């Protein structure tokens, strides 16, 4: 007797293997998508990082002036565009905050194609000039601790942790 084709058990094994691979690959791909969207924010913030570093080198301190109460005034003093003009496919705005040179990156909504764990959340770039040169680190919130209502730390780029 000459059999051609696959038996039912062979087909079931192949389907099970594909299911296991998909169960591992799909969440990893979703993490990859979220991380690339956050990386766009880091890239868009590079102009603000440079402007704040130049301001610090010229004035010996970060922009922390009470007379510059609005984001537009702070951006003008730094020579940056309006916060909402510094945007991208996933990033709503990049803003120089009042707090000692901090930069806040805010993401668009799910309706704009942003990953659900990134949508409408923000992260901060916090400068450290204690060793003569400026280094930047990322944080989820003002305290640096990440909570469920903020961007999860696993999505922050490893280059700024």
Walk through the language-model features, giving the residues of each.
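Membrane-proximal N-terminal amphipathic helix
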Residues: 34-64, 70-73
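Periplasmic/extracellular, small/polar-rich flexible segments of pilin-like filament-forming proteins
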Residues: 57-161
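Alpha-helical protein-protein interaction elements
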Residues: 21-24, 47-48, 54, 128, ...
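N-terminal single-pass transmembrane signal-anchor helix
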Residues: 1-49
């Amino acid at each position: 007797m000459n059999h051609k084709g696959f038996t039912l058990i062979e087909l079931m094994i192949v389907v099970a293997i594909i299911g296991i691979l998909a169960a591992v690959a799909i969440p990893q791909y979703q993490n990859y998508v979220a991380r690339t969207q956050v990386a766009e924010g880091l890239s868009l913030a590079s102009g603000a990082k440079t402007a704040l570093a130049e301001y610090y080198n010229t004035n010996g301190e970060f922009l922390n002036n009470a007379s510059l109460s609005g984001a537009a005034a702070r951006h003008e003093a730094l020579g940056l565009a309006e916060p909402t003009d510094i945007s991208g496919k996933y990033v709503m705005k990049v803003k120089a905050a009042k707090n000692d040179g901090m930069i806040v990156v805010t993401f668009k909504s799910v309706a704009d194609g942003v990953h659900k764990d990134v949508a409408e959340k923000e992260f901060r770039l916090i400068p450290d000039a204690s060793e003569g040169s400026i280094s930047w680190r990322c944080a989820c919130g003002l305290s640096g601790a990440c909570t469920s209502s903020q961007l999860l730390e696993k999505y922050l780029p490893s280059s700024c942790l």
